Every structure is written in structure tokens, then in C-alpha cells.
Amino acid sequence: MRANKIVYTSNTGFTRRYAEMLGKAAGLPVYDLAQSPQGGSALYLGWLRAGKIHGLARARKKHLVTGCCAVGLTDRPPMEKLSAQLPEGKVFYLRGGYDHGGQHGLNRLMMTAMIKSMERRPPEDAAAQGLLRAAREGADFVTEEQLSPVEDWLRG
């Protein structure tokens, strides 16, 4: 195993669901970052905000992060940008979802502004149209199938 635990930070539950699925499949304990015991190697799962993997810096201070799953809404992840955030480990992307009602404070303000900005210009293709619809109405793209490469890497 390339990690002895799974640690996550979740905002609206999509990342937590992936962490729990991975823990069950790999037989590893799963912890919310805030409650995780310090030390040991970890696969970290964090949600994306403005291209940054939320909580990764804190996870790296507390654990040896050997791999990371960035969970986001788009079907076109910026893998170079994501991989640069953990150059010494493996970075995966999992398409999660969006729940506007679950957003609060700054996150809600940022997403509301992003939706308004997207609405001002016509979507350039079907993917952009789908992203706008998901942001407006909410969406859930969590699937076990997306975890296959992560499970293979964990078994290493």
C-alpha cells in the first residue's frame, strides 16, 4: 500500500463520499483532516476552489501525503496545475459535484459571481453548457468507476 490511511476535506459531501468509497475498497481507515491522527503516509482528497486543492497544505504539515485526489466540478481538469501542487506525489482528478445550497460565506459569493459571469457570455461548447447547468441546478457526478486508477495506484 502506498498510504496507510485516507484523509479528506469536504465542503458539501462529494469528497467525503469518494474518501469513504476508497477506504472501503482499499481497507484503509478514513479521517476528516481535522480529526486525523498526525503522522504516517496518507492519500489526501480535497475539493477544488479557484484551482487550488483545498486543505492540501494543512494535510502535508500533518501527514506524509504520497498521493492526492482533487475533486471538482468540471470534466476538463487542469492536470498540470493540479500536479504542480504535489510534485513529490501522484495527483488524480475526480469529478464530484456541486450543491449551491451547501455553499456558505466566501465560497457561496465566489460561485454566485462565477455563475453570473458564465451567464453573461454564451457557452462555447456542450461541455461549457453542461458546466453552467450544473452550477445553476446542482449536480452529482460521483461514481465508483472514477476510483479505479486511484485504487490501482494505492495497491502499487
Task: Give a label for each model feature.
Residues 1-61, 152-156:
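N-terminal beta1-alpha1-beta2 submodule of the flavodoxin-like/Rossmannoid cofactor-binding fold
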